[in-house]
């Protein structure tokens, strides 16, 4: 049976070691996962990472939430500056997920995967509202990370320069798309590419 919650949010905070790489899932920063994310980072801090040379941060499916929940992961990465950094992306990354992407790029990540579902300059910090039988997501802030500008009111937005409003599209360093055949066979095209990318760099 199709698990919609798993598809929508994934398994934030879940991680595994594959040879000399840490693969960490940062698939949601919704408030409901706050404790889960914090506990996973605390657990990671106790792991022996001496033989881990690469951090693969998988933000695929991260449609946003509370951008402050990105900080636990980013601080952990900053405390391990000797590790190579790779970020996996897909079309389901939005809002605070794109903020995590920009943070990882700032930390030197090589991006592998698909284009994300939103421009780099976008609306974020959204809240969900239920009205009758309908659920709505309402964003309350506009961000342009590259120009370090933001707006929270109609007046502030109208006063932004045209440059600050111009759409900025993210293109991964290495474009890799999940194939239909691999999906049917349970193969993660993008992760497999990243693991082979690491292997080839070390040959």
Predicted regions and their residues:
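C-terminal "post-core" interaction segments
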Residues: 1-203
């Amino acid at each position: 049976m199709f698990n919609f919650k798993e598809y929508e949010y994934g398994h934030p905070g879940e991680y595994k070691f594959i040879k000399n790489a840490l693969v960490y899932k940062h698939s949601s920063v919704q408030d409901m996962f706050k404790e889960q994310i914090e506990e996973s980072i605390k657990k990671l801090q106790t792991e022996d990472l001496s033989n881990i040379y690469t951090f693969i941060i998988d933000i695929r499916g991260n449609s946003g939430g509370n951008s402050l929940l990105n900080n636990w992961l980013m601080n952990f990465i900053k405390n391990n500056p000797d590790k190579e950094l790779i970020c996996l992306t897909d079309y389901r990354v939005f809002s605070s997920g794109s903020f995590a992407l920009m943070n990882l790029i700032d930390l030197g990540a090589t991006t592998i995967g698909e284009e994300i579902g939103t421009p780099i300059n976008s609306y974020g910090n959204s809240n969900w509202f239920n009205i009758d039988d309908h659920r709505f997501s309402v964003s309350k802030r506009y961000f342009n990370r590259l120009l370090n500008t933001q707006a929270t009111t109609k007046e502030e937005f109208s006063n932004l320069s045209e440059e600050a409003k111009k759409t900025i599209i993210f293109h991964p360093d290495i474009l890799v798309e999940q194939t239909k055949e691999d999906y049917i066979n349970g193969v993660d095209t993008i992760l497999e590419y990243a693991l082979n990318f690491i292997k080839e760099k070390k040959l």
